Amino acid sequence: MDRAQLRGMGVALITPFDEKGEVDHESLRLLADYQVAGGADYIVALGTTGESPTIEEAERSAILQTVREAVAGRCPIIVGAGGNYTERLVNRIQAMDKTGVDAILSVAPYYNKPTQEGIYRHYRTLAESTDTSIILYNVPGRTGVNIKSETTLRLATDCPNIIGIKEASGNVDQVRAIVLEKPDPFIVLSGDDHLSLSFIKEGAEGVISVIGNAYPELFSRLIHLCLENRFEEAETIQQRLEGMCYLMFVDGNPAGIKELLYQKGLIRHNILRLPLVSASDSTSTLIARVRNQIEQR
């Protein structure tokens, strides 16, 4: 994958379900098209926001096929594939139909809490097992481990097909440390919508966004203004969206974004798979209120 294609806004696509809890491929197709038409620079399917832990292997293949058909070559597609048993993950990636897949977003090994050396060996083994580009995903709030900047830099230097990192540690100092010492082609992306402006000021080159599902045109505009160093204009958009960005996580992700998409009529059903549940009534009311404020301006 051309690393320059990661600059800008990628959308962490939700996985819509129907009233029976099955994948709603029609809503998925329409939503993927909505992202591309709205200015998303690339699509990320089957990540955290896509409820990947609850998706069966056969469903993954069908979801990817639907996304491929909807995108129709108009932008890159990145697919989430992570795990905490390296050998199993290697086998899974090797068996995956990667037709039309430009890169893999792979979350740090979770729950068993490896050391930094274990994290390094895990990702190096993945990188050596495939020619597909790999993007590291650091989200310690979910995994229980932080990929320290030193480990990221080792991987960026030692593994040519590890092309970037989605940084969702919330740690601006860590982002700064990576940016200062990384090899030139390695790309740093924000994993938090509300920190994107701050991260880009430190040298990050984009975001993998949740709020972009609902407002691709508006949030893409914010990100590209930041990349053009037009931060005052970007801050105006950020202030407009910051309340909604907060609400997306009050009841966990993707409960918030699915509620918003349902209210906007972009998905037909507001269904999550257990143990995740839909946003509470109070959160839904707040989302409706803030949505009205955003869309009236």
UniProtKB/Swiss-Prot annotation:
Annotated catalytic residues: Y137, K166
EC annotation from Swiss-Prot or TrEMBL: 4.3.3.7
Catalytic activity: L-aspartate 4-semialdehyde + pyruvate = (2S,4S)-4-hydroxy-2,3,4,5-tetrahydrodipicolinate + H2O + H(+)
Residues the record lists as binding pyruvate: T49, I208
CC annotations in GO: cytosol
UniProt keywords, alphabetically: Amino-acid biosynthesis, Cytoplasm, Diaminopimelate biosynthesis, Lyase, Lysine biosynthesis, Schiff base
One annotated GO molecular function: 4-hydroxy-tetrahydrodipicolinate synthase activity
UniProt main location, coarse: cytoplasm
Sections of the chain in a coiled coil: none
Subunit structure: Homotetramer; dimer of dimers.
Function: Catalyzes the condensation of (S)-aspartate-beta-semialdehyde [(S)-ASA] and pyruvate to 4-hydroxy-tetrahydrodipicolinate (HTPA).
Protein family (similarity comment): Belongs to the DapA family.
Name recorded for this polypeptide: 4-hydroxy-tetrahydrodipicolinate synthase
Gene: dapA
